[in-house]
Curated annotation (Swiss-Prot):
Residues 396-410 have a biased composition (Polar residues). Interacts with CDK2 protein kinase to form a serine/threonine kinase holoenzyme complex. The cyclin subunit imparts substrate specificity to the complex. Found in a complex with CDK2, CABLES1 and CCNA1. Part of a complex consisting of UHRF2, CDK2 and CCNE1. Interacts directly with UHRF2; the interaction ubiquitinates CCNE1 and appears to occur independently of CCNE1 phosphorylation. Interacts with INCA1. The lineage of its organism: Eukaryota, Metazoa, Chordata, Craniata, Vertebrata. This is G1/S-specific cyclin-E1. It holds the Pfam family Cyclin_C.
């Protein structure tokens, strides 16, 4: 029996080979071909892909098959739709953008300075804020926004997050609120911490974990709620998450002001204490919702003006006095409070390099300072009814009295 079974099985295999030999051969070749493709030189495969891409894109207008004259030239994304610059739910028109200004940037080794400057200015046109967004939320008050942002500053200091992270969160919060209606105050903390959660993941190398963000809310927000709100915010903002923040503009201005002979702008070269002094003025100003009336670049330039001079401001920002005059006057009571109370000393954080310490967001009694600034604003308004210039406005020093070496800072 075993012998007969073996003979019968052998005959069946021979029959199958005769009937389906071609199919088996094709399958075998197919397997070998797949293995060959898998094991071939990846450089050869990438070269084929590059040649195919060049052949397919040869007729595109931006490909002239010529050597690029400027290797630092930036190529715009083709067929990219213009950003929507209007908030659909906003009842107020967005603020007027300041006219384009000349580039103060030096010659850059890594890009064309005019193109970089153009991109920076375009961000101010596409990332809009609405100072009147609270009109869409009858149950909210300006004080609630100030309390929330002050708390976010405190969270940033606890977790040693950067100033850029805080200002990204502030921008996300304000722009998100401009797209919504009738938000209740019980949701503000969730929106704020979710905005900071997004900002930290974008900016920080080692952002805090989700449970750490939930922990600082003292049980008011769960991790799942933060994740849900995170997605809602990003969808409402149409995934536009890379604005040029107030502190980013300040960093650019300070870099240009303290350029060395090599004109390098890759690493900070300005005094940290002066940066902190100006940054704390901006920290106070951003708590007032009226700051959204001005573009971020003007806010940073106005803060720099209050601690330097008109000539330096114009040199590093490209603005003229008429461009920032209203913002400078609006900022006067805030600058007076900062000057009276004094700026904080540079704090050193464990695990943070000394050269990066000024970039860590710090917290002080900002709400008390805000109340003092508003009181001074009311006092100045009373005093200035008969005066064209508000008292306390810093008058630019005369050119003959300026120091000959280095930028002049207060």
């Amino acid at each position: 029996m075993p012998r007969e079974r073996r003979e019968r099985d052998a005959k069946e295999r021979d029959t199958m080979k005769e009937d389906g030999g071609a199919e088996f051969s094709a399958r075998s070749r197919k397997r070998k071909a797949n293995v060959t493709v898998f094991l071939q030189d990846p450089d050869e495969e990438m070269a084929k892909i590059d040649r195919t891409a060049r052949d397919q894109c040869g007729s595109q207008p931006w490909d002239n098959n010529a050597v690029c004259a400027d290797p630092c030239s930036l190529i715009p994304t083709p067929d990219k739709e213009d950003d929507d610059r209007v908030y659909p739910n906003s009842t107020c028109k967005p603020r007027i953008i300041a006219p384009s200004r000349g580039s103060p940037l030096p010659v850059l080794s890594w890009a064309n300075r005019e193109e970089v400057w153009k991109i920076m200015l375009n961000k101010e046109k596409t990332y809009l804020r609405d100072q009147h967004f609270l009109e869409q939320h009858p149950l909210l008050q300006p004080k609630m926004r100030a309390i929330l942002l002050d708390w976010l500053m405190e969270v940033c200091e606890v977790y040693k997050l950067h100033r850029e992270t805080f200002y990204l969160a502030q921008d996300f919060f304000d722009r998100y609120m401009a797209t919504q209606e009738n938000v209740v105050k019980t949701l503000l903390q969730l929106i704020g911490i979710s905005s900071l959660f997004i900002a930290a993941k974008l900016e920080e190398i080692y952002p805090p974990k989700l449970h750490q963000f939930a922990y600082v809310t003292d049980g008011a927000c769960s991790g799942d709620e933060i994740l849900t709100m995170e997605l809602m915010i990003m969808k409402a903002l149409k995934w536009r998450l890379s604005p040029l923040t107030i502190v980013s503009w300040l960093n650019v201005y300070m870099q240009v002001a303290y350029l060395n002979d090599l004109h390098e702008v890759l690493l900070p070269q300005y005094p940290q204490q002066i940066f902190i002094q100006i940054a704390e003025l901006l920290d106070l100003c951003v708590l007032d919702v009226d700051c959204l009336e001005f573009p971020y670049g003007i806010l940073a330039a106005s803060a720099l003006y209050h601690f330097s001079s008109s000539e330096l401001m114009q040199k590093v920002s490209g603005y003229q006095w008429c461009d920032i005059e209203n913002c400078v006057k609006w900022m006067v009571p805030f600058a007076m409070v900062i000057r009276e109370t004094g700026s904080s000393k540079l704090k050193h954080f464990r695990g943070v390099a000394d050269e990066d310490a000024h970039n860590i967001q710090t917290h002080r009694d900002s709400l008390d300072l805000l109340d003092k600034a508003r009181a001074k604003k009311a006092m100045l308004s009373e005093q200035n009814r008969a005066s064209p210039l508000p008292s306390g406005l810093l008058t630019p020093p005369q050119s003959g009295k300026k120091q000959s070496s280095g930028p002049e800072m207060a």
